[in-house]
Amino acid sequence: MTQWDGRGAFYDCNKLTSITIPDSVTSIGVGVFSGCSGLTNVTIPNSVTSIDFEAFYNCSGLTNITIPNSVTSIGDSAFKGCSGLTSIMVPYSVTSIGYGAFEGCTWLDKIYYQGAAEDWNKIDIENTYNDKLTSATRYYYSAEKPTASGNYWRYNENGEIEEW
């Protein structure tokens, strides 16, 4: 199996709270977790290269999401309505973020990006209905304590995101 295609697979599974997507999956398909409001924890493997249209639509229980280094594309409305989402980790590999990908993410206020500011500016971001994505505070990755002013983050000794 290379793609999880929504079409009813996990649609509106409100009791689903946690899921680890198998390594065999390369694409999280259209609406696969749409309406899973109880979903609080998602582990996405490095085999996934795209998160498609409405993949996590209205997953209001998600508070943060780490997108793996393999993902290049975040589709239209992929995380639309994830009203509990407060932070996301966007890898350097992402080259496009679709229309309304983070629409309705009312509490999204922190974006941890694995690259520098100039790299972020190269991402093809469809700005329509992505206001929270573009207005959230962005933190750029730095393994060493930065000397320049700005917002930076690193991985701590436990592999967790930590702001400098």
Predicted regions and their residues:
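Structural signature of tandem-repeat unit edges
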Residues: 1-3, 13-27, 37-50, 60-73, ...
